[in-house]
Amino acid sequence: MPTIQQLIRNARQPIRSRTKSPALRGCPQRRGVCIRVYTTTPKKPNSALRKVARVRLTSGFEITAYIPGIGHNLQEHSVVSVRGGRVKDLPGVRYHIVRGTLDAVGVKDRKQGRSRYGVKKPK
């Protein structure tokens, strides 16, 4: 327990909360270039081949981002927009690629939950 004099000398520091998406530097989205597009397996008890991309952002960070939806057109040197949001069963993946912007096209034949996958309303 500190004395009153010690508290006067240097006050208590508030506990700073760490950001969950440091590479975005406080921005809602960031632009980046795909360095490598590949699949990876989730941790137990799940089993799949999750599509992810290694992205170099304009903020200088190099991150791993998840590619949501069924099928994609991304390859090396594709320019993508990245938002925050982790994938629970992929350790180290704390970002999502935004579908329907820049080089990432929307998901084909998607009818429900379209706004998340960059799909226009069908006629």
UniProtKB/Swiss-Prot annotation:
Primary residence: plastid
Protein's cellular compartments: Plastid, Chloroplast
Source species, domain of life: Eukaryota
Keywords carried by this UniProt record: Chloroplast, Plastid, Ribonucleoprotein, Ribosomal protein, RNA-binding, rRNA-binding
Gene Ontology MF: a single term: structural constituent of ribosome
InterPro entries for the chain: NA-bd_OB-fold, Ribosomal_uS12, Ribosomal_uS12_bac
Keyword Kinase attributed: no
Pfam families the record matches: Ribosom_S12_S23 (PF00164)
GO annotation terms (biological process): translation
CDD domains in the record: Ribosomal_S12
GO CC list: chloroplast; small ribosomal subunit
Subunit structure and binding partners: Part of the 30S ribosomal subunit.
NCBIfam families documented for this protein: rpsL_bact
PANTHER family: 30S RIBOSOMAL PROTEIN S12 FAMILY MEMBER (PTHR11652)
Entry similarity comment: Belongs to the universal ribosomal protein uS12 family.
Task of the protein: With S4 and S5 plays an important role in translational accuracy. Located at the interface of the 30S and 50S subunits.
HAMAP family hit by this protein: Ribosomal_uS12_B
This protein's name: Small ribosomal subunit protein uS12cz/uS12cy
Organism of this sequence: Psilotum nudum (Whisk fern)
Source lineage: Eukaryota, Viridiplantae, Streptophyta, Embryophyta, Tracheophyta
Gene: rps12-A
